Amino acid sequence: MEPTFHAFMFPWFAFGHMIPFLHLANKLAEKGHQITFLLPKKAQKQLEHHNLFPDSIVFHPLTIPHVNGLPAGAETTSDISISMDNLLSEALDLTRDQVEAAVRALRPDLIFFDFAHWIPEIAKEHMIKSVSYMIVSATTIAYTFAPGGVLGVPPPGYPSSKVLYRENDAHALATLSIFYKRLYHQITTGFKSCDIIALRTCNEIEGKFCDYISSQYHKKVLLTGPMLPEQDTSKPLEEQLSHFLSRFPPRSVVFCALGSQIVLEKDQFQELCLGMELTGLPFLIAVKPPRGSSTVEEGLPEGFQERVKGRGVVWGGWVQQPLILDHPSIGCFVNHCGPGTIWECLMTDCQMVLLPFLGDQVLFTRLMTEEFKVSVEVSREKTGWFSKESLSDAIKSVMDKDSDLGKLVRSNHAKLKETLGSHGLLTGYVDKFVEELQEYLI
């Protein structure tokens, strides 16, 4: 029997980071390893149902120190606007004493981290291994966080002429520029000083970008595969949504979801709704209420609900995205191109229309659209604005089975799904990852 290890996990205080770390923790626990998961106190309740091995994965809550400017009680990115991320990062750095005390008391064999660049210092002092585990795409890491990199400029030797920023991406780079200096320092410092770099991806999608990162940091890069979550079949799809979707033929409904951090301005939210209406297809929109509105209904265009009654639903609350994507009536998924969302969608038969908002989403969109040609990107103006016509045109182009573009993306998506779904591929990544970790610990 292979020896087991005890790992600490300390992800950035965002559910988009904590949940993928917990998916990895589940895979490690399944193989008999012990995990101590460090997280903000308030986040524990929301993560408990993702813990499939509560006897092996122990949550270790941290008290988040107060930082001037951070709202009282704010502990995760869900509690703040994107512009306050730097303040939450300060709070994360101030938990160092708590983390070090836990390391001293519990003596793990290794510690996984992402933004806490000081973890390798603690690890070396206590003779344990540190793993910089990145859940963002390897494409983004290669382009944005190469040593000596400059925001928005491809670094020397970058391995793609297609996966690039363009003039119309200034809106996404503007958001990234707010915290780029901090992020660049955190990630590059972590990469240079850690023992192991690990990425949530696979060679079939991002192999050349992983090789580039390895060459830039002179370290072997371990891959976990996409770490797809186990499907939660304990709760069926919300009855109201299930009833709505079941009224339509297979692969006829357009589903739109933009992730937990994207809040649209009211005029852009209305343009999104009008674009979905313009397709003439049945649709389900699941997004947060627009700025200045407490509900999605408040922000809808005048007369919209009456015009789309029976064929369109705008949902302002949380939805069971994996169950919706698995529903036979869903034919197209309009999304923000978060890597986790794309991995989910690639394993379905839904066609993809991509509407990226943040820098990492833009690059992953180009990978899917320009290199793999499995999706279509919604065109934008230089300001970042997208029109109802550009959204409608993108959706109709992938939903038209007879168009050249529709045939191309369907064919390429089917091939990629077959590759990723081939027997043993994804479990093989996890097995190899664990084996390589154990070799480092010998």
From Swiss-Prot:
InterPro entries: UDP-glycosyltransf_plant, UDP_glucos_trans. Keywords: Glycosyltransferase, Transferase. It is an enzyme of class 2 (transferase). One of its GO terms (molecular function) is UDP-glucosyltransferase activity. UDP-alpha-D-glucose binds at residues 260, 319-321, 336-344, 358-361. Coiled coil: none annotated. The keyword Glycosyltransferase applies. Its EC number is 2.4.1.-. Belongs to the UDP-glycosyltransferase family. This is UDP-glycosyltransferase 79B8. It comes from Arabidopsis thaliana (Mouse-ear cress). The gene is UGT79B8.
